[in-house]
Amino acid sequence: MRLDKFLVDCGVGSRSQVKTFLKKKQVTVNGQVETSPKTQIDENQDQIAFQGQSLTHETFVYYLLNKPQGVISATEDARHKTVLDLLDDTARHKQVFPVGRLDIDTHGLLLLTNNGDLAHAMLSPKKHVDKIYQAKVDGIMDQEDILAFEKGIELKDHTCQPSKLEIVSVDRDAGTSLVQITIAEGKFHQVKRMVAACGKEVADLQRLKMGPLSLPNDLELGVWRRLTQEELDALTVFGIPLT
């Protein structure tokens, strides 16, 4: 493997930044300063260090983000803050992207990775990957709504697949409901439109689960972390190489 590719994979910087670091003699291979980006190295045997810090090669990385409201699920945008803006420089240089999208005013679990095959598998309609949302609803949701979800909500442009509506609590004095909704699709504003089709309105929407991944209770809004080994093991169900 070329040294510059190794350094980019490790999140040291972009390819052009890496060339600058090499010129400044900030990279060593087996203890010797190396300045050529074309140098061939063995990522499993050679000891590579940047600014004195030893590096370990990673082809793919996986970050779990508790996305806040007001941030869009994109890699770049001229008007809005993106989920990549919440990462540090090292994580951003891994060239990750969000797996699927959450609306700008929806918060909760979002997976970021640079593994395109895994993202494709998790988003494929053929895989029927369940997403679980918790919604605060203006209006009282009832058994009739549960049956409508089970049957498949009819929207103007789409009949939704059968889904699950669970009523967590109801405040009749305030005229509000707290519900959990499980869907396998990911159409535009789908949960909000499904609730609206029942004559109610989503006031707040949070994603709790996507496939085998769950939003950790201790992960604060706007904070991200690497997936644990247990979470990575759970992703093997998709049959995609993760390393």
Annotate each predicted stretch with a short phrase.
Residues 1-243:
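Basic, flexible Lys/Arg- and Gly-enriched helix-loop patches that mediate nucleic-acid binding at interfaces
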